[in-house]
């Protein structure tokens, strides 16, 4: 199968990337979501005295009763914050001491978060516009957790942002052998500030519409993932596609230039689209430096990109379809009625 370089498709791709899902944006300026304020749990935690960690944590729990317990038990993995749980206090103390240099490295970059508050406020307005019944997180909080901890987490009462996941692609600890083993460069290149709001809104989209495609045929997983990308474009109309898809612009251009060849690959691969074999599905859904059996220019997670094209084709044929209606439509229906056949 002959794959093309994206040069001839560049103009089309640029136009597509600029427009994409963003051409019918509503005016959300009048939607009230309140003032978005990011509570600085990170600053408060690393201001504790490590010699009096128990007293400090209890003060912190009084100030942040909606997050401190979740931080200790779930993010640090130390169990409940209780007098009888000495492991929790020791784990918190060790983490504070060992990660203080990390916090000091991040502090200049994230001293102010007003820019992020503005981005989230705009995103929350789009969420409320499309899904008025959804209850937005009442709190937004910044923390610094272990490097294998979440970059974004939705707790019962908050949207929590783990700044350790956004130290910059060239942050020294990401580039160590251990760091690269945990987060290879095709992942850590996205550990930049511009991905924070997109990751937050993607987490909210997943909270509104939990992913139930696990164990389903590959094509259903593809359309499910692609549908999330389509929704991300609606919730973040000013955000480049390269941010919420996780692709580089070059990868998006390559996919656009080779769309028909990519689709033919799936059609010619012995009922691959209907496979439920996890070992097969993981080659096309999920992180990876490239797609198995495709050229080096191909991105990983190519199945999500194809699913995205299928969703866009379906939406273009169903004028007036709302995001809620799309997200409630069975993915097999979306695939079959899209009659997706790229030229």
Label every model-predicted segment.
Residues 20-89:
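N-terminal mature-domain "stem" immediately C-terminal to a signal peptide or N-terminal signal-anchor/transmembrane
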């Amino acid at each position: 199968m002959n794959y093309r370089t994206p040069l001839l498709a560049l103009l089309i791709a640029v136009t597509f990337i600029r427009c994409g899902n963003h051409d019918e944006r509503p005016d959300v300026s009048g939607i009230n979501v309140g003032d978005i304020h990011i509570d600085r749990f990170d600053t408060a935690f690393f201001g504790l005295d490590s010699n009096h960690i128990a007293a400090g944590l209890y003060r912190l729990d009084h100030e942040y009763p909606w997050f401190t317990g979740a931080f200790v038990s779930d993010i640090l993995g130390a169990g409940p914050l209780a007098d009888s749980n000495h492991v929790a206090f020791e784990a918190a103390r060790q983490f504070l001491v060992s990660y203080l240099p990390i916090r000091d490295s991040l502090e200049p970059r994230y001293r102010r978060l007003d820019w992020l508050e503005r981005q989230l406020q705009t995103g929350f307005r789009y969420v409320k516009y499309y899904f008025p019944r959804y209850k937005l997180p009442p709190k937004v909080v910044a923390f610094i957790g272990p490097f294998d901890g979440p970059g974004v987490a939705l707790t019962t009462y908050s949207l929590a942002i783990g700044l350790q996941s956004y130290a910059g692609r060239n942050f020294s600890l990401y580039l160590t052998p251990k760091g690269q083993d945990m987060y290879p460069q095709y992942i850590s290149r996205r550990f930049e500030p511009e991905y924070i709001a997109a990751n937050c809104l993607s987490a909210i989209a997943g909270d509104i519409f939990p992913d139930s495609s696990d164990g389903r045929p590959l094509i259903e997983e593809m359309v499910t993932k692609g549908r999330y990308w389509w929704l991300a474009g609606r919730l973040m109309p000013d955000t480049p596609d390269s941010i919420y898809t996780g692709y580089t612009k070059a990868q998006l251009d390559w996919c656009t230039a080779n769309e028909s060849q990519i689709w033919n690959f799936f059609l010619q691969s012995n009922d691959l689209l209907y496979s439920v074999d996890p070992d097969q599905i993981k080659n096309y859904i999920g992180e990876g430096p490239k797609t198995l059996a495709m050229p080096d220019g191909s991105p990983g997670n190519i199945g999500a990109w194809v699913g995205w094209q299928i969703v866009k084709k379906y939406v273009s044929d169903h004028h007036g379809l709302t995001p809620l209606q799309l997200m409630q439509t069975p993915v097999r229906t979306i695939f079959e009625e899209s009659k997706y056949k790229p030229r």
